[in-house]
Amino acid sequence: MTKDQMRHALNVIYDQIFNQGQADLLPGLVSGPYIQHNPLFPNGLDGIMGYIKQAKRIPCEVKRMAIDGDLAFVHVRYLDWGGQETAGVDIFRFDMDGKIVEHWDVLQPVPAVSNNANTMF
């Protein structure tokens, strides 16, 4: 597994699967039982695949991406996550073949008003 393989998989997720709604590409990027730490989705692909197919697309902008060993961290601006703009950080663990085997995320709605002039992105 190389950093380029990992970046390629992540670009496919955000550009083609989320932004373009090509959910059928996801199984080719994932291996094993796919451990999911988001409490809204079960382990395995069925939950996230169903969500993507129902949503049709999940418009987003990748702001930052970092890779450390077998982990990748992606700071994302979700333009319409459940009806609202949302800041997210996705963490993916890859196996030796460059396939995703585990996922964590944190999501925070972007507030209409902030107590500082800093953006979330």
Task: List each model region and its residues.
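C-terminal and inter-domain tail/linker signature
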Residues: 1-121
